[in-house]
Amino acid sequence: MQYLLEYIRQYGRFQRNARLYLISMALSYVTVGIITVLYNLYLIALGYNTDFIGLILFIGTLGAALTIIPAGVCVDRFGGKLVLIWSSVLIGFAGAGQILFRTSVPLLVSAFIAGIGGAFILVVNAPFLALNSSEEERPHLFSINLVIMLVATVVGETFGGLLPLWFAAGHTLMGPLPAWLNGALAAKNQARAYQLSLLTASVIAAPSFIPLFMMEDDRLLYRRQQTATTEERRHFSELWNTSVTRIRAFFAPGYHTRLRSALARPLTVLTALYAFQGLGAGLFIPYMNVYFVQHLGASPALFGSIDGAANILNALLTLIAPWFVVRIGILATLLIPRLLAIPLMLVIGCVPYLPLAAGLYPVRQGLADMSQGILQVFSMERVARKHRGVANSSYQVAYQGMWAIGASLGGLVIQNVGYPVVFISAAVLYCLAYLPLWWRFRLDTKSERPS
C-alpha cells in the first residue's frame, strides 16, 4: 500500500506532457486489449482461415519494418507531440478499414498502414518519456507506464470478451437495418457481433486524442537532443567504417577459426536467442484466441478472462524475478522458468481439453515471460557499453523479423496440418534458443567481461 501511495504522489510530480501521455495510453490500451481478443475471431467469422491471418500479421509487420528508420527521422524533426497525434490518426483510419472492409485486398492494405502507424508509436515511446522527465522521475515514470499498459489491456480483454455476447443477445444493430447501413456491416450474425464490438473499441480509443492535443509543444526538446547527439552519430559512422574493414579481414585466409570465434561471441549467441524466440513465438502466440475459441470451444468472454489472468500472473512473477536472481543466479533465472514453460506449452497444444488448457495457459505465459526484463538487462551487460545501441537494434530486428516470419508460417501450418505441429515446432525452437545460452554463459556469468 505504501508503494502504491508513493506512485500516486509521484504521478502528481511528473511533467505535464508525461501525465497526459499516461492518460492517453490508458485509453488506447483498453482498445488494444479488445482487439487482441476479437480481431482474429472476426476474420475467422468472415470466412478467412489462419493462413490469411498469418498474411495479415506479416504485412503489418512489414509496414512497420519499412518505416522504423523514417519514423525516427520524423520524431527528431517534428517532435513527439505531432508524431503521436498524426500516427494515432493514421492508426485510427487504418483500424476503421480493418473493421469495415471485408475483402482481402483492402484488409491487407489497412494492415500495412496500421503497421506504419504502429512503427511511429514504437519509435516515439521511450524517447518521449525520457525527454519529458528528469533522471529521478524516470524509474517511476517507466514503471507506471508499464503498469498502466498492463491494467488497461486486462480491462480491455475482459470487456472485449463480453461485448460480442451483449450484441448477440438481441441488440438493435443485429436486426434488419437500412440498406446504406446494412452494406457497412457484416451479414452473418457472429461476424457482425465481433464487428460491432471492434467498432465499440474504436469509440473507446477516440478520447485518447484529447490528452495529445493538450500537450505542450516539445519540438525544442528534440532539437536540443539532436544537437547533443552529433558526437554519437560521428561515433556510429566510425563504427560502421570499422565494421566494414573487419568484415573484409574476416574472409582472409584462416577465416574458419575466426568464424568459430565469432559464433561464440555474446552478441552472436544473444542475437540467435532472440531470433529463435521470435520464430517460435510467432508460430503459435498470435493464434491463441483462435485456438481457444474455435478449437477448444471457449467463449470469447472466457478467453478474455484467461488472457487477462495470464497478464496479471505475468506481472506478479515479473516483480519477484529479481529475488530469484539473488537466490539462484541470473542464468538460472533466465533458463529454468522458460524451460519449465515448454512442457506446459506442449500439453496445451497437444491435449485438446479446455479446462486443462485454461488452467495451464496463465502459468505457461507467466513462466515464459517473468524474466523478460532480466533478459534485457543481461543482453545489454554482455556487450561493451559503446556497442549496446547496435546490440539492442540487432536483438529487436532479430526478434521482430523472425516473429513476422513465424506468424506467417504458423497460419499456413495450422490451416494445412493442425495445431500440434506448431506447438511442437515452437518447443524445438525454444530449446535451440536456450541451450546455446546455457553453453556460452554457464561457467561464469558474473566475472566474464563484455566483448
Where are these regions (language model features)?
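Juxtamembrane intracellular "pre-TM" segments in multi-pass secondary transporters
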Residues: 1-15, 217-272, 451
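Helix-loop boundary and gating motifs at the non-cytosolic
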Residues: 3-63, 266-308
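Hydrophobic core of transmembrane alpha-helices in multi-pass small-molecule transporters
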Residues: 26, 94, 105-121, 275, ...
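Central cavity-lining transmembrane alpha-helices of secondary-active solute carriers
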Residues: 55-73, 308-320
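Conserved MFS/SLC helix-loop-helix module at the cytosolic interface between two early adjacent transmembrane helices
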Residues: 66-102
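Helix-to-loop junctions at the C-terminal end of transmembrane segments
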Residues: 67-79, 164, 317-330, 414-415
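Structural signature of the two symmetry-related core transmembrane helices
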Residues: 82-97, 332-347, 424-427
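C-terminal membrane-cytosol helix-exit motif in multi-pass small-molecule transporters
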Residues: 168, 202-225, 436-441
